[in-house]
Structures are given as structure tokens and as C-alpha cells.
């Protein structure tokens, strides 16, 4: 559920633990979703029968204005077909949902680029179910130790937990790009690289996420880059893992779930 203020949260939840409130005060509006026990105002249909509701205050003026105009929290699932690459612009949404929705509100490109971090705060433990725009390190700085649950094959507690997700239609392989490229026709390769172009592959068949090696910039460009490469006439998209720290962990999570093969 998306809402516009922390004060609104108590209207549709049973309790709001102090640690969760601390995180909300630090990171809202922003890329953090908190799972909280729902009250009777939230129908089971909205939460797929779960006893918790996912709550977030988004950090965009247009969305906040929309939410302030409503007298109820807004359920807002991802605007893309299940399992495909997440959209980060209104054009992405239009391309895949044209004719299926009445309106698309265009607020520009997504500034974070990847989905929110999903966390559940209970009295005895704090659990991250999806890595996202707020890093594990940032959360630990605020509330101490947390545990991670990254996969669920059935009845996931949060979105983005299935082992296969965010996937292009073109085969998508993780590994050492230079080595992998030897196995394919150079004219039929797409490359999603962290910070440098690859030799022997046409530049128009490559996306560099951040030439400066900035993880936040890489996150901004991730899904748009994957979508661009998926439109090309290539047989395979080759990619590499990023540094396993900060937002790099969330980016790598998306790459691994999207991958056809990991080498």
C-alpha cells in the first residue's frame, strides 16, 4: 500500500514497531517498503491472503500529490507483465500495457532505477525479503543486525523473491564477458557491462551502466539497458556481476534472477 504520510500508516495496520518507525522516519519518502500486520480495513484479496501489508511512501512529488488526493491507501503493483524486466519510464509501461490500462501518469524516468527494499520488523527479528534501493548497510546503521531471506519458490512473502524474475526474452548469461564472447558470433552479442566497453562487439550492441563505476548510476540504468538490449537482433546478452556491496548487491540480485545461465 502506498500512502503519503507516516501518520496514515496506523489507520490500516495493527501495530507499528519502534524499529520500523525509526526506519520510516529515516528513509521515507523513499525506496523502502515495510511489511506490517494489517488490520480489517485491508482485504485479504489485496495481500494474497497474507496477514501483513507492504507499506511505502514514494519519493516523487506527482505520486505524493495523487496519494494526498485520496482518502484511502493505494495498492500499486508493478506496471509490467509478470517476470519481465521492470519498467523505469512511462514509455516502457505503454509498450507492454497498451490497451490494458486507461491512463498512464508520466512522472519521468525512475531516479533510483530498481525496486524498493522490502523489510519486515518484528519484536524478535528484522528480515529483508528483497534487496533494493536502500542498502543493507544503510539499514544496519539505523537498527543493527538483520537477516535476509532471498528466495521463495511458492507463496512468497514479498514480490521479487522468485528465483527467476526481471528476465529479458533473449538468453541472458552472467560471467566474464571477454571469455564468454568467444563462444558467439560477435555480430549477435549484446553486452551489459558495469563500467567499460568490450572489444570486438559493436558499440551499439553494448550498454555501460556507469563509466565512472558509480553503483547508484548503474542502478538507474539497469532495467532500461536490459530492455534496450532485448530489442536488438542478437542471440545472447552477456553481462557481469558488480561489486558485492551497497546497491551492487541489489543490482546483482536482479542480474542473477534474470539470468538464463551463470558461468
Predicted region positions:
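Active-site-adjacent structural elements in enzyme catalytic cores
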Residues: 1-263
Amino acid at each position: 500500500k502506498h500512502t503519503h504520510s507516516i501518520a496514515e500508516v496506523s489507520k490500516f495496520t495493527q501495530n507499528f514497531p519502534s524499529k520500523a518507525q525509526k526506519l520510516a522516519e529515516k528513509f521515507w519518502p523513499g525506496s523502502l517498503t515495510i511489511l506490517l500486520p494489517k488490520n480489517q480495513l485491508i482485504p485479504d484479496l489485496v495481500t494474497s491472503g497474507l496477514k501483513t501489508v507492504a507499506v511505502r511512501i514514494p519519493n516523487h512529488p506527482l505520486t505524493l500529490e495523487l496519494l494526498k488526493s485520496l482518502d484511502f491507501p493505494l495498492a500499486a503493483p508493478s506496471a509490467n507483465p509478470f517476470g519481465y524486466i521492470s519498467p523505469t519510464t512511462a514509455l516502457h509501461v505503454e509498450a507492454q500495457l497498451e490497451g490494458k490500462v486507461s491512463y498512464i501518469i508520466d512522472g519521468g524516468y525512475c531516479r533510483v532505477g530498481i525496486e524498493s527494499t522490502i523489510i519486515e520488523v518484528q519484536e524478535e527479528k528484522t528480515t529483508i525479503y528483497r534487496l533494493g534501493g536502500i542498502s543493507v548497510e544503510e539499514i544496519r546503521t539505523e537498527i543493527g543486525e538483520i537477516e535476509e531471506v532471498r528466495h521463495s519458490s511458492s507463496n512468497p512473502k514479498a514480490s521479487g523473491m522468485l528465483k527467476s524474475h526481471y528476465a529479458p526474452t533473449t538468453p541472458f548469461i552472467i560471467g566474464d564477458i571477454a571469455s564468454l564472447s568467444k563462444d558467439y558470433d560477435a555480430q549477435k552479442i549484446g553486452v551489459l557491462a558495469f563500467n567499460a566497453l568490450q572489444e570486438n562487439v559493436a558499440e551499439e550492441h553494448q550498454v555501460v551502466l556507469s563509466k565512472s563505476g558509480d553503483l547508484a548510476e548503474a542502478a538507474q540504468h539497469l532495467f532500461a539497458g536490459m530492455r534496450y538490449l532485448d530489442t536488438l537482433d542478437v542471440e545472447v546478452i552477456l553481462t557481469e556481476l558488480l561489486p558485492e556491496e551497497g546497491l551492487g548487491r541489489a543490482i546483482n540480485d536482479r542480474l542473477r534472477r534474470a539470468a538464463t545461465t551463470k558461468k
